[in-house]
């Protein structure tokens, strides 16, 4: 257990210190200043109080006031002056730390997002990775306090350590027996605190998963786009019940945690009472017997309190820092998730490209079942291929493998007789313009959603909008192409219809102008006539480019060069529309005959 803690604490603390030094080294000046101020204030208060009390006692005892008042006034002025100065410096330092805390929070949010965007795609569909990502996000933010939170704990240990050394020197001279009393009580309280902190870590892991599930249902309830389904299917109660369930799970877990920690809190309270009683008895006895002055009594009481709370603060901050490092370590664990996909460095040559699947089989990570088996197909430059099949036949998986979102389990995929693993990822993916059925639009302007990182070409953009049938709708918007999509971050934004959203996604693919274009059922929300028009325009625009169409409605089949029919985890039929439709009791012919009545007039 101890070695396990060290594996978390030391790397995390080292990482935090290194990150702070690299990005905001001036933060350490603020911490050093706070340490000096804390020590100065502690020593001034303890020592000045002794002399102040002794001077007042001398006056009360019949001494000449004029001999003692100046010293008393000086002590008061020194205490007040140092206190005010310390308050001012601490205020300024805390403001600086708050600013840096926000900066580091944003820094790690961006770093985590970049990690998600760069990691292998398979990780983004893995529940364990998603849970770890949630732990990383929570662990690096409010659970640990991030860089500033952990550095606060670290420098509190340093500051209190310096203060403790100062008061130990005072106590060793005046009331030496106070040292074992304070230390023994501290050891006991440390034991109780550690046991309580272990429960915090234990319940954190349990709460992290519950919070992710609760967050999902809360998002679904607050997401405006779910409004139609919730109302039409009267699912509000079901959604609320699920959200309430996980909310109650959270409350019950916290209640269970606090109940388990309660006894350790009571043990600590009892120890504190015994410590204070023994300390006051010892100091009071020395004062009554004349061994120390009244000022010494005050100094001993103050020193004993400072010693105990200094030691307690050291132990408490060590425990808190250990706990915080345990939380923040979840970020390091997430950041350490390695990619399994090999990274090539070959550049993609210009010119014609031939795609070849050779005996490709694939099963998803953590699954024993193959979703594709023995896929063999060659797609030549400029060929238009239609991929058809029932839901779950593996059509989208086929595209994911081609785009190298996953690596094949067996076999290989070649582009121009070179295994796609040998190509640079960024170079390879430039070959493709893809519109998936679960495409994502962003709360940016319509123009930005289409162009993304591509260079802006207004003429090309207008032509693309016209080809996709979105130009007229775009020109009717208040700010035309600069109109923000959705109202999430802009009250003047527009809510596009499902069909308009799909046309926008198609525009994005067309605008990229890649040599291989893929449409993975992006027109599901359109009616058959509109779908056919989109496909027809799209096919004209694609021209000599390689194109792969996936659609249940078979609208693209007649104008495609070849058709691949997926069923039973493999390609069951392959050929032209005319060839496949003639196969008696064939999969394609049955699908075509079942659907022909919906669009035969439009595609004839």
Model features per residue range: what roles?
Residues 1-14, 101-148, 210-253, 325-336, ...:
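Extended non-transmembrane interhelical loops and adjacent amphipathic helices
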């Amino acid at each position: 257990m101890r070695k396990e803690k060290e594996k978390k604490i030391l790397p995390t603390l080292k990482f935090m210190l290194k990150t702070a030094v690299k990005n905001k080294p001036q933060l350490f000046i603020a911490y050093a200043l706070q340490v000096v101020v804390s020590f100065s204030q502690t020593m001034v208060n303890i020592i000045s109080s002794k002399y102040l009390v002794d001077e007042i006692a001398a006056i009360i005892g019949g001494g000449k006031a004029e001999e003692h008042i100046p010293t008393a006034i000086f002590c008061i002025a020194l205490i007040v002056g140092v206190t005010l100065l310390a308050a001012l410096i601490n205020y300024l330092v805390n403001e600086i730390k708050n600013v840096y805390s926000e900066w580091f929070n944003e820094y790690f949010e961006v770093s985590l997002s970049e990690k998600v965007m760069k990691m292998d795609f398979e990780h983004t569909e893995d529940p364990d990775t998603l849970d770890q990502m949630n732990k990383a996000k929570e662990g690096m933010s409010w659970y640990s306090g991030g860089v500033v939170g952990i550095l606060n704990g670290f420098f509190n240990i340093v500051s209190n350590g310096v203060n403790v050394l100062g008061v130990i020197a005072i106590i060793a001279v005046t009331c030496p027996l106070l040292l074992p009393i304070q230390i023994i009580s501290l050891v006991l309280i440390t034991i109780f605190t550690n046991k309580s902190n272990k429960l915090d870590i234990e319940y954190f892991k349990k709460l992290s998963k519950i919070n992710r599930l609760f967050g999902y249902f809360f998002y679904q309830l607050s997401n405006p786009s779910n409004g139609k389904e919730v109302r039409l299917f009267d699912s509000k109660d079901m959604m609320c019940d699920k959200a309430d369930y996980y909310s109650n799970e959270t409350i019950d877990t916290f209640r269970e945690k606090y109940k388990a920690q309660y006894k350790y809190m009571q043990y600590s309270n009892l120890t504190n009472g015994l410590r204070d009683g023994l300390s006051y008895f010892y100091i009071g006895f020395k004062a009554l017997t004349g061994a120390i002055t009244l000022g010494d009594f005050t100094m001993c009481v103050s020193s004993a309190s400072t010693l105990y709370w200094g030691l307690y603060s050291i132990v408490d901050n060590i425990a808190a820092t250990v706990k915080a490092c345990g939380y923040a370590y979840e970020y390091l664990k997430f950041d350490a998730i390695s990619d399994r996909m090999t990274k090539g460095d070959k550049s993609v040559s210009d010119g014609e490209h031939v795609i070849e699947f050779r005996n490709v089989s694939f099963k998803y990570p953590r699954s024993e079942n193959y979703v594709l088996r023995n896929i063999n197909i060659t797609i030549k430059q400029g060929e238009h291929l239609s991929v058809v099949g029932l839901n779950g036949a593996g059509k989208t998986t086929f595209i994911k493998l081609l785009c190298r979102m996953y690596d094949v389990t067996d076999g290989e995929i070649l582009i121009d007789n070179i295994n796609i693993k040998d190509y640079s990822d960024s170079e390879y993916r430039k070959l493709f313009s893809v519109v998936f059925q679960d495409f994502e639009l962003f709360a940016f302007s319509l123009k930005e959603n289409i162009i993304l990182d591509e260079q802006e070409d207004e003429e090309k953009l207008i032509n693309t909008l016209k080809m996709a049938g979105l130009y007229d709708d775009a020109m009717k918007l208040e700010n035309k192409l600069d109109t923000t999509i959705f109202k999430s971050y802009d009250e003047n934004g527009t809510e596009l219809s499902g069909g308009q959203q799909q046309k926008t996604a198609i525009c994005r693919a067309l605008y990229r102008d890649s040599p291989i274009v893929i449409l993975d059922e992006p027109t599901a929300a359109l009616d058959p006539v509109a779908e056919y028009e989109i496909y027809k325009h799209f096919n004209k625009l694609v021209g000599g480019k390689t194109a792969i169409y996936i659609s249940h409605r078979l609208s693209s089949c007649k104008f495609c060069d070849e058709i691949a029919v997926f069923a039973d985890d493999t390609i069951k039929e392959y050929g032209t529309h005319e060839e496949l439709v003639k196969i008696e009791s064939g999969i394609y012919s049955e699908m075509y005959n079942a659907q022909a009545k919906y669009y035969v007039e439009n595609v004839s």
